[in-house]
């Protein structure tokens, strides 16, 4: 049996703006995504039996990841890819029945509901790996289109590099940014994303910045956030989830030493503080260890993934 193990990374949003509402009822966003070295691990094993009329994969995880297996983005990704192949005459029904069953084992490390995109990353990794194992030959653009139908954060993990994201998150433009390190805190809070979008205090009319400004003025949103940049969900989540407010307060107490701006990532519960890699504000390892020990929530030290990282070279 052939077995391939693939890392599935998390992401953070350096800022997150809503720039208006679309005619389809969704919101237009503008954000900058960074991929980080916090991973789930997926192992794809090609079994010695055909799928027949069953689902093309079987998912195994050491920890339950959704109440219903069919709600998991790994399962949804496999189902969507198979449907795309069938609808575009890449497979006949007879060929589909002869495809080998793929066993997918998920080792879950990325916290769920954190705004780190763990489920979306798993879905993206599944699309890319099954595209290879089934020899479909789809390109990144096609896989991103399938991914966008599964969730707004899925395409960035197929894109595989730092990017400006617009639309609902599916319009991606590469951006070159310096390496960064972060202290992440994960409060124990469940955030209902749909409720956030409906919240009366949510800012929905942010300025849309052109790409030239974002590329040339990255100092306004990387280590610090200038007044023009924010995560619009942050004040709403703080008000709804006291544990998130506590975590942000803790990071703000550290920011006097780092000179950086703590913030929320995505629309989840995870917050982070950029850590200077060089200079007088560089935080030594023993101090970082103390900060983690004193943190009011589980914590992680992570770094950004370099463009072209081997962890994303699936094609």
Identify the role of each PLM range:
Residues 51-67, 126, 148, 220-231:
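Short, basic/glycine-rich phosphate-binding loops at helix/coil junctions
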Residues 105-134, 152, 261-275:
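Glycine/serine-rich anion-binding loops at beta->alpha junctions
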């Amino acid at each position: 049996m052939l077995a391939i193990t693939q890392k599935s990374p998390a992401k953070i949003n350096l800022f997150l703006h809503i720039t208006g509402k679309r005619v389809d009822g969704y919101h237009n966003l503008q954000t900058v995504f960074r991929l980080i070295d916090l991973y789930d691990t997926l192992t794809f094993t090609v079994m010695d039996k055909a799928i027949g009329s069953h689902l093309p994969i079987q998912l195994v995880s050491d920890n339950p990841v959704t109440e219903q297996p069919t709600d998991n983005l790994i399962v949804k990704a496999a189902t969507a890819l198979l449907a795309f192949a069938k609808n575009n005459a890449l497979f006949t029904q007879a060929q589909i029945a002869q495809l080998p069953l793929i066993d997918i084992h998920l080792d879950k490390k990325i916290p769920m509901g954190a705004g780190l995109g763990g489920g979306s990353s798993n879905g993206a990794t599944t699309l890319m790996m099954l595209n290879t194992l089934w020899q479909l030959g789809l390109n990144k653009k096609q896989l991103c289109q399938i991914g966008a139908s599964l969730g707004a954060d899925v395409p960035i993990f197929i894109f595989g590099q730092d990017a400006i994201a617009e639309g609902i998150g599916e319009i991606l433009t590469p951006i070159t940014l310096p390496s960064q390190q972060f202290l992440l805190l994960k409060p124990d809070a469940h955030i209902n994303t749909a409720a956030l979008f409906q919240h009366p205090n949510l800012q929905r009319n942010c300025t849309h910045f052109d790409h030239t400004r974002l590329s040339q003025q990255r100092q306004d949103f990387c280590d610090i956030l200038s007044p023009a940049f924010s995560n619009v969900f942050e004040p709403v989540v703080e008000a709804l989830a006291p544990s998130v407010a506590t975590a942000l307060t803790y990071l703000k107490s550290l920011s006097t030493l780092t000179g950086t701006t703590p913030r929320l990532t995505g629309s989840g519960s995870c917050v982070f503080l950029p850590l200077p890699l060089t200079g007088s504000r560089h935080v030594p390892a023993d101090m970082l260890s103390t900060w983690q020990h004193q943190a009011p929530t589980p914590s992680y030290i992570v770094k950004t993934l370099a463009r072209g990282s081997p962890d994303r070279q699936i094609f």
